[in-house]
Every structure is written in structure tokens, then in C-alpha cells.
């Protein structure tokens, strides 16, 4: 689950980290009022969406009057912002962050992720702030500095000082950076985060450090023990199909192809997508119905897949272990009848009662193509999607 920038900065402030004075507003009038509350003669206004690249898309602007702040809010509130990280529809803007202006001397980067190989929280810092850190890591990996956090003792001040020295910070800046580093590490652990970024972490003209941005991603598996963060969830930023799938405990990720995939098991689902690609097809989604694939869940899975107008054929690949293939076959038949599937459906069943499942499908009288193997299934569904 992602947080908006203004929500991330609220958490930063709770941990005593330096952030700009600002207000999240949802009307143009409140945007003008926020300028009065903040004071000064210049403000930064930012459209709040769960996507990067807002500045280039016109979603971030420096304004010099309350009227300009109000006009910016009128321009974006209730509209969709399209950036390089969104699809063609963009994401809806329901909040505008109005902030005080910051005099920037230099931009740094500071972030943290859970490193799966070391099973530790790893902090990354760089002098290349304000740009895409993935590009920095690819082009100039030597510019990425790292500090691994021991889960037994947590982040240590000496690690912050070491990073600060390597970043070229001096004097009181080292103390400030260490405070930010330790605070972010505590926040990361306290709130079960999966990713945290301050990009950029800036050195102001007066020499002080300042968190100019906040990107936070929470481990969704830990939300049950983070009620405060659950309450911050903005469902308007979620893909509608993915939100529907979550309600039915289906693992769904929308993609850009035209072949819908329904599979039980994440590994088998990835393998299915690979073999579809191998035979010239493009998957429209990743969908794992899990081990408890009931008729109801299969029906909802079909609804989700077919809500994508790009889908020209559906491949159902089930390995029957705990779940019997004949029961899955009945679920598929019921779902096809209920949903009114108009595109070709290719089904490959293997494992527990696979032959009986194939027989049930054959006797259904529906336009369901039974495949004899995974390769056959991939070839059949690619042909079907091409109208052959």
C-alpha cells in the first residue's frame, strides 16, 4: 500500500524530521487559505497522486500569489493526472499539497528497502538526488552508498555519520543527517514499511538539511497490525480490477496484453505467462486464484479478467492438488454461463481428477477448448486471440 506525499510528511514530522510547513487541501478556497496560514510570498503546490513524474506532467508548480494557488487547485482537483508512471487514464487528484518554498543549494538522495537476499533493511544514499535513482544505480552504481541495518540493534548513529562523511557533508550537517537517518530507520521498522524514499533530501542555502519529498510503501501483509496506516489508504488510487480482486483474495496484476490468464499458484502463473510469451502471445494479466479455487472465486476471476476490453481469449491453467480438477471444471462451466463469456476459453487441467475434469468440460456443450498440455494450451490460446 502506498501513501501520498502529504501523509508521508506527517509521519516524518512525528519523528522530528525536518519537513516543509504545508497543508493538504481539497478545495480551491482552502488552497488560498493555506497560503495565508503558511505565510511568505512563494509557495509550492503539488497534486497528490501515487505516481512519480508529477513535475514534468504539470502536477507541481511554484506560485507567487494566493490566486495562482487557487487556480492550480481548480485546474487539478477532480481531474486525472497522467505521468510516465501511470497508464493512459492517469490517476485522480483529490488533494493538493500547499507548502512553503525552500531555497535549495544541493540535492541528495536517501532511501531504504527490505533487501531480500540479506533479509535486512538496507539504506541507500547518493549525491545524485532529485533524479530517478534506478537510472543512477544502472549508469553509475558506484554513486550509491549503502548501510545495512542489523535487526538486533537497529540503525546506529555511526552508520549515519559514515554515510554523511561519504556524501561530503560537514560540521552540523553530519549531526543533522545522522538524526534523519536514525529517525527514518525507526519509522521504517515501527510502521512495517517495504520502501521509503526522500528524493530529494536537500541542503538549503543556509546549510541545513531538509526532507523535500516523502515516498512510502507499506508491506500490505502487515496492515492488520497498522490500523493508523490502514486509515490512510486512498482507494481512488487503486486499479479498480486489482481492488475487486483483493476483496475476493485473488492475486491480480493488470498487464498490457490481450490474453487473460487464470491460474492456481503464483509460480505456475508466472510460468504460464512465460510460455504464452514464448509462443508469441501477450498476457493481459497475472491472476492467481490460490489453492481454494471455488466456483464463486472462479466466477469473480472471470469477471475481473473480462472487464479488460483488450482481452481476446482466456487461458485457464489449473494443477489439481488439494483442489479436484472436476470441481474446478464445474466452477468454470458455471462461471462461463453466469458471466456470459464471449471470447474463446482454453482450459488445461492436470493432477487430481484431471481426466474427469476434461470429461465434464467436453460434455458441457460450451465453447471451451480443452488442451492436452501446457504447450498445447499456450499455442491454442495464442491462435484464438489472433482469431485463427
UniProtKB/Swiss-Prot annotation:
GO terms for cellular component: cytosol; succinate-CoA ligase complex. GO terms for biological process: succinyl-CoA metabolic process; tricarboxylic acid cycle. ATP binds at residues 46, 53-55, 99, 102, 107. SUPFAM superfamilies: Glutathione synthetase ATP-binding domain-like, Succinyl-CoA synthetase domains. Succinyl-CoA synthetase functions in the citric acid cycle (TCA), coupling the hydrolysis of succinyl-CoA to the synthesis of either ATP or GTP and thus represents the only step of substrate-level phosphorylation in the TCA. The beta subunit provides nucleotide specificity of the enzyme and binds the substrate succinate, while the binding sites for coenzyme A and phosphate are found in the alpha subunit. HAMAP family: Succ_CoA_beta. This is Succinate--CoA ligase [ADP-forming] subunit beta. The gene is sucC.
